[in-house]
């Protein structure tokens, strides 16, 4: 069973990987494995150099972003607009594969602007497949590069999940993962049972990370005994070990555990304490533990 956490770095960070603070950009804790590094770019040599540098940090997968529709990303010539240049994507994939024995994967949309017929995405996948890629993460919406914000691009273009199933049928020896508005583990299981090799869950897991505690039980019938409080203890230990005196980092980590208490009485107080500047400064690495005690009276 592989549950991948993904760390995404865009074109600016690609350049910073080569020239900047690599430990800050690429470092992570060993318990986070397996971790995939998502890169954005369209220059095969730069991407290969980024992968070569990142390999020292022990990433388990390298993913090329061919799905982001933002204007900033388009100006950098990467993201969803790369689907219009499949040969460039193929060259990037080959260059990345040449410097690593880890999987090089591609995340993409099912179309771009008016190119929304099945043949377009089938040919894109076929070209990248011929370059050696065998793992595709399919966001089952088209990307509209003009007139929509990234948020609107996650909501307005219609969801066409059948496209991912057609791709799996046409490329049966690939690992095909489906992405896009998967809101629950039951929904994820239904997609796997229907023939997908896996799913990528994004926003639903971010907004309610506790849903991930049920993955083993729902997908594999294996019960778990993890509690939210245990997660709080682990996150506190993580902050103590890595960011004891780094208020900026503590604030960032706290922001990303907001959803742990979603649906619980006291969740509002939990969020208030986590975002309180005075609490962040005074409690430091003990902030998350303190917030839980304030909201739920246990610790």
Regions found by a protein language model. Give the residues of each.
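Short, structured active-site "lid" loops
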Residues: 23-38
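Alpha/beta catalytic cores of nucleotide-metabolism and tRNA/nucleoside-modifying enzymes
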Residues: 91-94, 99-101, 112-135, 159-178, ...
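Single conserved hydrophobic/aromatic residue that forms the stacking wall/gate
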Residues: 1-13
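Alpha/beta enzyme core
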Residues: 48-62, 66-78, 87-174
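Short gly/pro/ser/thr-enriched loop/turn and capping motifs at secondary-structure boundaries
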Residues: 14-15, 70, 144, 205-209
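Hydrophobic faces of well-ordered beta-strands that scaffold small-molecule active sites
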Residues: 7, 35-39, 62, 104-108, ...
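Alpha/beta catalytic barrel-like cores
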Residues: 11-17, 50
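Glycine- and other small-residue-rich loops at beta-strand/loop junctions that grip anionic moieties
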Residues: 39, 81, 85, 107, ...
């Amino acid at each position: 069973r592989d549950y991948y956490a993904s760390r995404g770095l865009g074109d600016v960070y690609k350049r910073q990987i080569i020239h900047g603070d690599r430990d800050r950009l690429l470092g992570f804790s060993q318990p986070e494995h397996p971790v995939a590094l998502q890169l954005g770019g369209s220059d095969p040599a730069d991407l290969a150099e980024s992968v070569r540098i990142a390999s020292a940090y022990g990433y388990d997968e390298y993913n090329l972003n061919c799905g982001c529709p933002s204007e900033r990303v388009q100006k950098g010539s990467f993201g969803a607009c790369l689907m219009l240049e499949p040969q460039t994507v193929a060259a990037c994939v080959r260059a990345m594969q040449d410097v690593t024995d880890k999987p090089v994967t591609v995340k993409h949309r099912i179309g771009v602007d008016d190119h929304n017929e099945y043949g377009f995405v089938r040919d894109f996948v076929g070209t990248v497949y011929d370059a050696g890629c065998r793992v595709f993460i399919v966001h089952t919406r088209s990307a509209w590069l003009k007139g929509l914000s990234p948020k609107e691009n996650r909501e307005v273009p219609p969801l066409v999940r059948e496209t991912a199933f057609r791709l799996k049928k046409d490329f049966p020896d690939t690992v095909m993962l489906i992405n896009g508005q998967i809101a629950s583990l039951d929904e994820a299981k239904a997609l796997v049972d229907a023939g997908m090799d896996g799913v990528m869950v994004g926003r639903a897991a971010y907004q309610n990370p506790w849903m991930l505690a049920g993955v083993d039980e729902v997908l594999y019938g294996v019960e778990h005994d993890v509690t939210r409080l245990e997660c709080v203890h682990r996150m506190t230990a993580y902050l103590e070990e890595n960011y004891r005196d780094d208020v900026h980092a503590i604030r960032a980590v706290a922001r990303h555990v907001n959803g742990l208490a979603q649906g619980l009485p006291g969740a509002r107080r939990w969020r208030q304490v986590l975002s309180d500047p005075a609490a962040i400064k005074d409690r430091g690495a003990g902030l998350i533990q303190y917030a839980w005690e304030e909201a739920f009276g246990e610790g």
